[in-house]
Amino acid sequence: MAGPEDPLPNWGTGRVNLLGDAAHPMYPFGSNGGTQAIIDGRMLAWELARADDPVAGLAAYEDACRERMNALVLSNRQGGPEQVLQLVEQRAPNGFTRIEDVMTNDELDSIAMQYRKTAGFEAEALNTQPSWEVAKPA
């Protein structure tokens, strides 16, 4: 049985499916729980509008989102972008004055970029993905 922070093997069956925290419960890191629920809702609406039947739309929604969200659940288990706090505590247990004395800008940028990539928030990926607009029947 999956624990509260373990990725779920599936989000639904037939005409019943989960989204948001119900589908991908995770530690509250990265400040994106609400964002992920909105993205899920938008993707679900898009897939349902494109599908010939609701069951196919629900399956397409899960197929489109589950792998990325499972990676994000696992990333958040490791602290997500807040892993910076763990590293700083390890490197400077007695405190510090400037973050640059503890971590390089490259390290900070790398952690942030990796999380954006895992979450699907990289600017290039967002700017090149197809529109979620569904053509209305004439």
Model-derived regions: residue spans:
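Conserved mid-domain beta->alpha element of the FAD-binding
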Residues: M1-Q78, E82
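C-terminal lid/capping helical subdomain adjacent to the catalytic/cofactor pocket in oxidative enzymes
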Residues: A22-P28, R42-P54, E62-E67, V84-A138
